[in-house]
């Protein structure tokens, strides 16, 4: 018998999905989507909407699990500085706490379910953004270093929002989503782990401040050695055309200036190695900081330079480490003051 089955429906469906896939993967769009973008856009939109809503409207959260809720929303008297999305309750611990795990929406808000919602959607969305960076570079035939550089802030955020709460046993120990909450997290982290004395944190400080210094030095050197292509009464910027093949500044002039200002080998004579250094310095340092936070999440503080100095007779030689330790004890006994029966956490 002759097969009269109509294949036009499948042909139309195939052409439709071919168009959709072509649109998703097109590098000609004003905003590249990509396979990772399908995941990234809804996740980041959900995280952003939930964060803004919670920052403005969320009711107080029982962060310590002792029935003393803490208000973080603007409608409860906070301002931009003091406002925050309060971390999930200590009564929840590290349990996954979607809204259907609570008896009702009010209970979910009271236990800080919004924090987990925002943090997990944000981390997954930021990870998808990093994957999208790699995917777009791959489509254009570029090298993959852009997504490698973005991995630094991603692992740093993952360390304070995910790894540290898991290591400490509760999302209530995660960093609050607000300005003053961030400072509170830093003070408590210092009190409990003495991170200022950790070499990995020191590397991170060198990365951030050093990266700022190197960026300012590079930008000022380039701006000071631009090749003049215009008359004296016109801005140097007019002499630059987007996509031009000619160099826009004299690296030899910048190299000669800086080499004589400091010393010869402090200056790069290769533009490629220079820009790789500018990218690698802060990225590697922030990797180390994230690693330090992640190890301290599990109370592995053995690398700290916080030991007191004892002479051969057993007498204490006062040092900066002792001053910092005393300050840490003061901060430790003051935070979560109603939740503790002892000066130190029994962690």
Swiss-Prot record:
Biological process terms from the Gene Ontology for this record are:
photosynthetic electron transport in photosystem II; response to herbicide
Positions of transmembrane segments: 32-49, 121-136, 145-159, 200-221, 277-291
**A Pfam family of this chain:** Photo_RC
User: Per its record, what are the GO molecular function terms?
Assistant: chlorophyll binding; electron transporter, transferring electrons within the cyclic electron transport pathway of photosynthesis activity; iron ion binding; oxidoreductase activity, acting on diphenols and related substances as donors, oxygen as acceptor
Kindly state what the record says about how the cofactor is bound.
The D1/D2 heterodimer binds P680, chlorophylls that are the primary electron donor of PSII, and subsequent electron acceptors. It shares a non-heme iron and each subunit binds pheophytin, quinone, additional chlorophylls, carotenoids and lipids. D1 provides most of the ligands for the Mn4-Ca-O5 cluster of the oxygen-evolving complex (OEC). There is also a Cl(-1) ion associated with D1 and D2, which is required for oxygen evolution. The PSII complex binds additional chlorophylls, carotenoids and specific lipids.
Q: Where in the cell is it found?
A: Plastid, Chloroplast thylakoid membrane
Q: Which InterPro entries match?
A: D1/D2, Photo_II_D1/D2_sf, Photo_RC_L/M, Photo_RC_L/M_CS, PSII_D1
Record-listed chlorophyll a PD1 binding positions: 201
**Which amino acid positions bind pheophytin a, per UniProt?**
129
Top enzyme class, one word, equals: oxidoreductase
Residues flagged as site, Tyrosine radical intermediate: 164
Stored PROSITE patterns: REACTION_CENTER (PS00244)
What's in the keyword line of the UniProt record? Calcium, Chlorophyll, Chloroplast, Chromophore, Electron transport, Herbicide resistance, Iron, Magnesium, Manganese, Membrane, Metal-binding, Oxidoreductase, Photosynthesis, Photosystem II, Plastid, Thylakoid, Transmembrane, Transmembrane helix, Transport
Q: How does it sit in the membrane?
A: Multi-pass membrane protein
Site (Stabilizes free radical intermediate) found at: 193
Which amino acid positions bind chlorophyll a ChlzD1, per UniProt?
Answer: 121
Which amino acids does the record list as binding [CaMn4O5] cluster? 173, 192, 335-336, 345, 347
Q: Which Gene3D superfamilies match?
A: Photosystem II protein D1-like (1.20.85.10)
Give the protein's function. Photosystem II (PSII) is a light-driven water:plastoquinone oxidoreductase that uses light energy to abstract electrons from H(2)O, generating O(2) and a proton gradient subsequently used for ATP formation. It consists of a core antenna complex that captures photons, and an electron transfer chain that converts photonic excitation into a charge separation. The D1/D2 (PsbA/PsbD) reaction center heterodimer binds P680, the primary electron donor of PSII as well as several subsequent electron acceptors.
The record's listing under PANTHER family reads: PHOTOSYSTEM II D2 PROTEIN (PTHR33149:SF12), PHOTOSYSTEM II PROTEIN D1 (PTHR33149)
Return the protein name: Photosystem II protein D1
């Amino acid at each position: 018998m002759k097969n009269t089955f109509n294949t036009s429906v499948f042909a139309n469906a195939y052409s439709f999905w071919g168009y959709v896939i072509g649109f998703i993967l097109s590098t000609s769009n004003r905003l590249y989507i990509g396979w990772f973008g399908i995941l990234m856009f809804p996740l980041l939109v959900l995280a952003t909407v939930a964060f803004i809503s919670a920052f403005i409207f969320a009711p107080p959260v029982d962060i310590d699990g002792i029935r003393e809720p803490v208000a973080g929303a603007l409608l409860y008297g906070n301002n931009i500085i003091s406002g925050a999305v309060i971390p999930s309750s200590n009564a929840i611990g590290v349990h996954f706490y979607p809204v259907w795990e609570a008896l009702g929406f009010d209970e979910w808000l009271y236990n800080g379910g919004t924090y987990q919602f925002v943090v997990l959607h944000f981390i997954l969305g930021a990870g998808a953004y990093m994957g999208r960076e790699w995917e777009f570079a791959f489509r254009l035939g570029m090298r993959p270093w852009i997504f490698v550089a973005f991995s630094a802030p991603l692992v740093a955020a993952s360390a304070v929002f995910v790894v540290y709460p898991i290591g400490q046993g509760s999302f209530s120990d995660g960093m609050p989503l607000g300005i003053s909450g961030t400072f509170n997290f830093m003070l408590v982290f210092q009190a409990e782990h003495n991170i200022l004395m950790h070499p990995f944190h020191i590397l991170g400080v060198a990365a951030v401040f050093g990266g700022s210094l190197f960026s300012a030095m590079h930008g000022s050197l380039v701006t000071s050695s631009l090749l003049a292509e215009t008359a004296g009464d016109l801005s140097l910027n007019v002499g630059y055309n987007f996509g031009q093949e000619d160099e826009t500044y004299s690296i030899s002039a910048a190299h000669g200036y800086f080499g004589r200002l400091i010393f010869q080998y402090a200056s790069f004579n290769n533009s490629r190695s220079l820009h790789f250094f500018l990218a690698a310095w802060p990225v590697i340092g922030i990797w180390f900081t994230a690693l330090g936070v992640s190890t301290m999440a599990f109370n592995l503080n053995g690398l700290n330079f916080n030991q007191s100095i004892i002479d051969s007779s057993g007498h204490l030689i006062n040092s900066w480490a002792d001053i910092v330790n005393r300050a840490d004890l003061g901060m430790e006994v003051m935070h979560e003051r109603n939740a503790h029966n002892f000066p130190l956490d029994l962690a």
